[in-house]
Structures are given as C-alpha cells and as structure tokens.
UniProtKB/Swiss-Prot annotation:
It comes from Salmonella paratyphi A (strain AKU_12601). It is a multi-pass membrane protein. Belongs to the UppP family. This is Undecaprenyl-diphosphatase. Bacitracin is thought to be involved in the inhibition of peptidoglycan synthesis by sequestering undecaprenyl diphosphate, thereby reducing the pool of lipid carrier available. NCBIfam families: PRK00281.1-1, PRK00281.1-2, PRK00281.1-4, undec_PP_bacA. GO terms for biological process: cell wall organization; peptidoglycan biosynthetic process; regulation of cell shape; response to antibiotic. It is found in: Cell inner membrane.
Length: 273
C-alpha cells in the first residue's frame, strides 16, 4: 500500500469514525462496511480503529472539559446558561452508576461478546437499535422528569447504565442505547445525550486502552503517519459532529436516525451477503 493511498484511507476512516462514534447510528456498522469496501481489514486495521477512537474520545474531553472537571470537584466560572442546556451539576457517583452494569457484564462475557463481532450480528443490532430509538420517542414521558443533567437521579443514571449493556452487542450503538434508555427513564433528549457523551469518556477510554495494549504488537513505525492522520481527522470531525448533533436534537426527534440505521443494515446485507 503506497504512502498516499494509506493516508487517504486513514483520512476516510477518520471521517467515518468521527461522524458516527457519538451519533446513535453505530460506528461499528459503518466501519466494517467502509473498511471492507476499501480493502482495509485484518490486525493492522483493528489496531487503527482503536487509535482513531482515541481521537473521538479526545473530542468529548475538549467539548465537556468543564463538566468533567466538575465531577472531581474542580469548578470553573460558567458562562450564561442557554435555554435547554444543563447546568452541569453532575456527580462522579452518577457516572459510576452508569458504568457498573456494562463493565461487569463486559468482563464476565468478554469472549462471548467478541464472538458476536460479525456482519450478520451487526446487521441485526442496527435494526433492533433503530426500533429502540423509535420506542424511546413514542414511549417517553410528555414532560421529562429530568430536563437537565442537574435533575438526574442516581436511579436514572443506573438504569441508563443497564441500557448501555445493549451496546455490548456489536452494531447496537452505545450512544443509541444510552440516549434511548435515558429518554425512557424520563430524562430529556438533550440531557440524555449529554450524559451519554460524558459516560463515553471513562467507558471508551478504558476499553480502548485495553484493546490498544493487546494490539500493540501490530503497530509499526511505518504505520505512525497513517495512524496520526486518522487520529487527527477523527478528533476534528467528532468535535464538529458533537456540536452539530447537540444543536440538531433540539429541533428534531431520533426517528430520522432510526430510519438511517435501517438503511445501513440493508447496506451491510448487500455488501456482505
């Protein structure tokens, strides 16, 4: 693979990762389709995906640094509150409660979960995750009991964590599962999305660092430029995607995202079957 070709592939996959990682559309489904079409598969590709995920995580840290510092008791002066946004009064206990179910289940069934990573299971997860988004929009309370992060209860945080377990099914979408769960628990669409992003930092960071440690032997000096391009691209695109997404969900429901998931599921079927 030529240097320019590999850098182009890195940029394309970085864009795909950045756009889809935190949207409820399944980054896994998109990555396996695009990776297959580009002919970029195997151990190096898996290591590359782990590295560019770190770029996406960094985007969340940059976007929510104030709230993240607040979790450990460090508070900074806040700008004037905008309508519909949370005040960021979240505690570390909320995050821990949101993490526990998926961490426990992930450790206990690690090998089983890894065995589910194939196109057919991803396709089914895309469909079921889309149905959950529709259910969340149809069944959510008319008036959210927790319009902002500061209104969330420990019980709601734990239940969102239980819904996050669905994301252990490859292709389901971690953000799709947690946001849907939050809405069904009476958290507003916006606050559920914010909590999903904050919850992603420790969850994804832990999983990504572990995967990177296991995949370190596949990383060579020759791959560094490609990995760097993918990392930076994923970071920049994820930053834009998160900002756009948070503005968009103030105006539209998640139904369009559900329909899009069905389209991606059909694409997986066409490409792999």
């Amino acid at each position: 693979m030529s240097d320019m070709h590999s850098l182009l592939i890195a940029a394309i996959l970085g864009v795909v990762e950045g756009l889809t990682e935190f949207l409820p559309v399944s980054s896994t489904g998109h990555m396996i389709i695009v990776g297959h079409l580009l002919g970029f598969e195997g151990d190096t590709a898996k290591t590359f995906e782990v590295v560019i995920q770190l770029g996406s995580i960094l985007a969340v840290v940059v976007m929510f640094w104030r709230q993240l510092f607040g979790l450990i008791g460090i508070h900074f002066g806040r700008p004037l509150q905008r309508e519909g946004e949370s005040k960021g009064r979240l505690t570390l206990i909320h995050i821990l409660l949101g993490m526990i179910p998926a961490v426990v289940l992930g450790l206990v069934f690690h090998d089983t979960i890894k065995s589910l990573f194939n196109p057919i299971n991803v396709m089914y997860a895309l469909v079921v995750g889309g149905l959950l988004l529709i259910a969340a929009e149809c069944l959510k309370p008319k008036e959210p009991r927790a319009p902002g992060l500061d209104d969330m209860t420990y019980r709601q945080a734990f239940m969102i964590g239980c819904f996050q377990c669905l994301a252990l099914w490859p292709g389901f979408s971690r953000s799709g599962a947690t946001i849907s769960g939050g809405m069904l628990m009476g958290v507003s669409r916006y606050a559920a999305s914010e909590f999903s992003f904050l919850l992603a930092v420790p969850m994804m960071m832990g999983a990504t660092v572990l995967d990177l440690y296991k995949s370190w032997s596949f990383l060579t000096a020759a791959d560094i430029p490609m990995f760097a391009v993918g990392f930076v691209t994923a970071f920049v695109v994820a930053l834009i995607a998160i900002k756009t997404f948070l503005q968009l969900i103030k105006r539209i429901s998640f139904i369009p995202f559900a329909i899009y998931r069905f389209v991606v599921a059909a694409a997986v079927y066409v490409v792999f079957f």
